[in-house]
């Protein structure tokens, strides 16, 4: 092959790769979410019945990450705080996947955010967060909630001068077998009296027996934004299960590069994450 032919071939290959990237990545606010299908199987019905609410305590609202054609969100540069991500104009999405894991039924719910946040400011492009809800049997009319595992980022905190703004999480999940009453939608804490200058008495009103509520917010310390239990109700998004996605959407999520964060429910990540989320 002469030099000219080699250069032409290289240019064609580079153009092909560049064209594929452009075709498969679109603006974060142009990704159309999947409508929630009517559940058919036992696992789909359970996933819809126990779909949690998401409250946005800090950072961006959740956005869809992929459309039916397999086009992936390009996210947003980690600057300018919540600019361009306070509302998902086409609607949001929660992604689900469930399975038996050892002798428990695991339901993973995942959300995508176009910016990541650390130390109360935008600090990166892309963020995936998820929770795993553990129950005894998806076919039961009234299930027993066995635990909940909330994802947390294990990245090194950003630094101000030479000081890290927070501490690094050692584990990718906060795993809990005891689920607080206030973690359920509709639950209330009502102040009933005052017993000191800063002390009060409360009564608690139970909420839903099917729907939990989680918050995407800072967990009370400096560091990266994470999943926490919410004390107030959030919103529900259309749920799409892994096996309900189009083939193109699944393939795109499997191969997409989301930088420092990963799609938690893909074939290459799902089992590993369930192992890390195991609270028993």
From Swiss-Prot:
<feature type="short sequence motif" description="Hepta-peptide GHRHDWE motif">
    <location>
        <begin position="123"/>
        <end position="129"/>
    </location>
</feature>
<keyword id="KW-0732">Signal</keyword>
<feature type="signal peptide">
    <location>
        <begin position="1"/>
        <end position="19"/>
    </location>
</feature>
<comment type="similarity">
    <text>Belongs to the Necrosis inducing protein (NPP1) family.</text>
</comment>
<protein>
    <recommendedName>
        <fullName>NLP effector protein Pc553546</fullName>
    </recommendedName>
</protein>
<dbReference type="GO" id="GO:0005576">
    <property type="term" value="C:extracellular region"/>
</dbReference>
<keyword id="KW-0964">Secreted</keyword>
<comment type="function">
    <text>Secreted effector that contributes strongly to virulence during infection by P.capsici.</text>
</comment>
<keyword id="KW-0325">Glycoprotein</keyword>
<dbReference type="Pfam" id="PF05630">
    <property type="entry name" value="NPP1"/>
</dbReference>
<dbReference type="InterPro" id="IPR008701">
    <property type="entry name" value="NPP1"/>
</dbReference>
<keyword id="KW-0843">Virulence</keyword>
<feature type="glycosylation site" description="N-linked (GlcNAc...) asparagine">
    <location>
        <position position="142"/>
    </location>
</feature>
<feature type="glycosylation site" description="N-linked (GlcNAc...) asparagine">
    <location>
        <position position="209"/>
    </location>
</feature>
């Amino acid at each position: 092959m002469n030099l000219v032919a080699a250069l032409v071939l290289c240019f064609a290959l580079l153009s092909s790769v560049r064209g594929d990237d452009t075709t498969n990545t679109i603006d974060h606010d142009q990704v159309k979410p999947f409508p929630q299908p009517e559940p058919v199987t036992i696992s789909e019905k359970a996933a819809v019945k126990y779909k949690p609410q998401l409250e946005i305590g800090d950072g961006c609202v959740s956005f869809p990450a992929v459309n039916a054609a397999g086009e992936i969100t390009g996210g947003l540069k980690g600057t300018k705080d919540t600019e361009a991500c306070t509302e998902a104009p086409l609607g949001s999405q929660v992604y689900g996947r469930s399975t038996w894991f050892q002798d428990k039924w695991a339901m993973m719910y995942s959300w995508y955010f176009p910016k990541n946040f650390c130390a109360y400011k935008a600090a990166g492009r892309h963020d995936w967060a998820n929770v795993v809800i553990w129950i005894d049997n998806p076919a039961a009319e009234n299930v027993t909630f066995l635990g909940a595992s909330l994802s947390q980022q294990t990245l090194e905190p950003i630094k101000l001068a030479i000081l890290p703004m927070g501490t690094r999480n050692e584990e990718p999940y906060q795993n809990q077998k005891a689920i607080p009453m206030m973690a359920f939608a509709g639950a209330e804490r009502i102040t009933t009296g005052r017993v000191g200058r800063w002390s009060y008495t409360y009564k608690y009103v139970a909420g839903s027996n099917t729907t939990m509520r989680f918050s995407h917010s800072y967990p009370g310390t400096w560091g990266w934004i994470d999943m926490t239990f919410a004390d107030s109700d959030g919103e529900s998004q259309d749920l799409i299960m892994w096996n309900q996605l189009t083939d193109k959407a699944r393939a795109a999520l499997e191969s997409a590069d989301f930088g420092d964060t990963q799609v938690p429910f893909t074939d290459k990540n799902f089992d590993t994450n369930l192992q890390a989320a195991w609270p028993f």
